[in-house]
Amino acid sequence: MGSVNFITHADVLQLIAKRTAEDCIIFLSGPTSRKTPLSLLRMKDVIAVNGSVQYLLNNNVKPFLYLLTDIRFLHRRREDFYNFSRNSQFTIVNLDVYEQASVDDQKYIEENCLIIRSFYRREKGGFLKKIKFNILKRVHKALLISVPLSKRGRLAGFCKDISIGYCSCHTIAYTAIQVAYSLKYGRIICSGLDLTGSCPRFYDESTSPMPSELSKDLFKILPFFTFMRKNVSDLNIFNLSDDTAIHYDIIPYITASELEDEIYYDKIV
């Protein structure tokens, strides 16, 4: 495999130019996503992940952007990946998906998708890693990251510009938020950001189910959201979920009716 053409700053600017709304909805896989009105999804740009796209397509909602960071989905539901990608305006995959894809799939990704890369493989801290990221964040002001000296500790971070990389943390939701922030949406609205119980997905997985590991990884995930809230002062983000593990002090709750009322008011003003 030759060198990988990662997403560039010019690519990000093109995505920003193609936006059709000031707000975006990140359409995730949690059960409460079904409560998000279709009328609302049709009025905002939608960033959809994994298998959630099928619900949107079934209801004539075309995603602005399809995001995939789990190679298992491509391996187990290859036809769905192609369908979701072709029916979304843009597709972003991460380096893991690209590297572990077949030669044919790599060719499709190269020609039709944008590729992002995580700053790290593992979230462990350590002296050398701390030095590395202290240097990196001086070079890239968009990278916010805290790395503990001990290898037993876990780092936390957030990147404001996906053209230089992103900070991963066991949930695609966090990656999607960094994508949305990079695209400079005025408001980021999460749908289906639940992370409760066994973390089930709302869509049918009767064929090629993918076991969810979110519940056991929750203790690794939550510190990233806390870091985000403390360090990204201009992040305007809300959660539509009324059953979530993310405290509303971190991502404030907003109702669909509040958003619909705004749309109605804008129409009559």
Swiss-Prot record:
Keyword Cytoplasm: yes
Catalysed reactions, as listed in the record: an alpha-Kdo-(2->4)-alpha-Kdo-(2->6)-lipid IVA + CMP-3-deoxy-beta-D-manno-octulosonate = an alpha-Kdo-(2->4)-alpha-Kdo-(2->4)-alpha-Kdo-(2->6)-lipid IVA + CMP + H(+)
Entry's Gene Ontology BP terms: lipopolysaccharide core region biosynthetic process
Principal subcellular localisation of the protein: cytoplasm
Keywords assigned by UniProt, alphabetized: Cytoplasm, Lipopolysaccharide biosynthesis, Transferase
Pathway: Bacterial outer membrane biogenesis; LPS core biosynthesis
Keyword presence, DNA damage: no
GO molecular function, one term: transferase activity
Annotated compartments: Cytoplasm
Enzyme Commission number(s) from the entry: 2.4.99.15
Record GO cellular component, one term: cytoplasm
Listed NCBIfam families: PRK09822.1 (NF007333), WaaZ_KDO_III (TIGR04437)
Function: Involved in the biosynthesis of the core oligosaccharide region of lipopolysaccharide (LPS). Required for the addition of 3-deoxy-D-manno-oct-2-ulosonic acid III (KdoIII) to the KdoII residue of the inner lipopolysaccharide core.
Protein name, per record: Probable 3-deoxy-manno-octulosonic acid transferase
Organism encoding this protein: Salmonella typhimurium (strain LT2 / SGSC1412 / ATCC 700720)
